[in-house]
Amino acid sequence: MTGEKILHSQLLTNSDMSSGNVHHTKPMMYNVTLPSYNSSSIGPVDNLKINERPGSHDHSMRSEMSSKNSGSDFMPQSISRSEGSVYQVKIDRGDSPNTEGFDFKVNARDLLLLRMSWDILLREYLTPKELKVFQALLYSNKHITSTERPYLNTAPDGMISKTIDPTARPRKTKQRDNDNKVDTALFCSQFYDNLIAMDPLLEEYFPSLKHQAVSFCKVLDSAIDNLENVHVLDDYIVKLGKRHSRILGIKTVGFEVMGKAFMTTLQDRFGSFLTLELKNLWGQLYSYLANCMITAGKDPMEKIQPDFSYNGDSVVLNFSIPKLAMHDISTVNKLQMVKTKNATIPHNITQVPTNKIPTEILLDNSSTPIKSDRESTPPISPKGSGSTKPSIGSSTVVESNTKKNNYDEKIHLLQKTAQQKNCSIM
């Protein structure tokens, strides 16, 4: 529908619009563009897909992280305020990663405004009557009666119940139709293009970014269907938060960039119809979903009671003394100390002599010399001869009387064996 224009009836308002009171005067015909066009000079939304983008979109994620955001921008984990009938409350529930720490509530009028605007985002075109109903609701006062709002009849035969009544169709059929709308909606393509315009590297870091844009729109669609009780989606949002944090590695900064791209897409689609009230409504809803996912993605931490006391302006640390293992002294063998002339030494330790002289016995037989180096060795006389003792070199052999007989027998046996084998015993 690029380039097409349809004549819509637009209500003229007087100067009392700023005070909130809108007088519905005689409608006049204007040649206006549909909300699917951008109200700026960029032209149709199809121009978002080319490289020539407006300067407001040409900035990287790093500049988004460092810039100070205005009140209309999104800062997940920081929105905890109340504006009108829409409020988001952060409840202190410790460090538990649960979406019950946040709450989002709207009144009947704002609920209808969110659902009507979401239906406009998913549709390709609007009839003049539908646009007139949405505009009347958008610029009307919150507290005026139904008689002052002829285009917002809440009766069963009213225009709103005929066009965008969320309970008019069965639940399953409506959910299936909404999924088909989200998959093929132009809003998803615009949202994806705005993400790439903010930082082209996002497509390299997250190859499934286009699929993530469609999934994000499905999450919004589920939230819009359950605005009466958003906690129905708690389990689903907790799983999404853990997946984005632990598997995809998306941090708080990623949710901030996505929030800015979402608001830019809303501005492109609604144009001048994106009032401050409608902008705050969508901002509160996105911040609620983002805060719940960020909180659910955090790993639970064990609480430890700090061991310190606060005394005035100073903090006194109390470090506990570690307990040492105590041994029983009675079970240890006590060394019996004996006094000597030089020092006191234990009595039950065996002393090893240090001045022991090593002994060496050299035996040789030269009756049948084989090598020249053995010819100079004197022979050993056999038993019974004049020299009964073996030849001993420089060493001295000390023998006891009790072992002498056994020693002679062994020597005689060795000599006899050596003579038979013609060798000497060293």
Swiss-Prot record:
UniProt-listed InterPro entries: Globin (IPR000971), Globin-like_sf (IPR009050), Globin/Proto (IPR012292), Mb-like_M (IPR044399)
Q: Under the GO molecular function aspect, what terms does this record hold?
A: FAD binding; heme binding; nitric oxide dioxygenase NAD(P)H activity; oxygen binding
Give the record's GO CC terms.
cytoplasm; fungal-type vacuole membrane
Coiled-coil-forming residues are none
The GO biological-process annotations, alphabetized, read as: cellular response to nitrosative stress; nitric oxide catabolic process
Which residue ranges are recorded for the region named Disordered?
1-20, 51-79, 155-177, 365-406
Q: Where is the Globin domain?
A: 165-298
Q: Where is the composition biased (Polar residues)?
A: 10-20, 63-79, 384-400
Q: Output compositional bias ranges, type Basic and acidic residues.
A: 51-62
Q: Which additional comment does the entry carry?
A: Present with 195 molecules/cell in log phase SD medium.
The record's similarity note reads: Belongs to the globin family.
Q: Which PANTHER family match?
A: ABL201WP, FLAVOHEMOPROTEIN
Q: What is this protein called?
A: Uncharacterized globin-like protein YNL234W
**Native source species:** Saccharomyces cerevisiae (strain ATCC 204508 / S288c) (Baker's yeast)
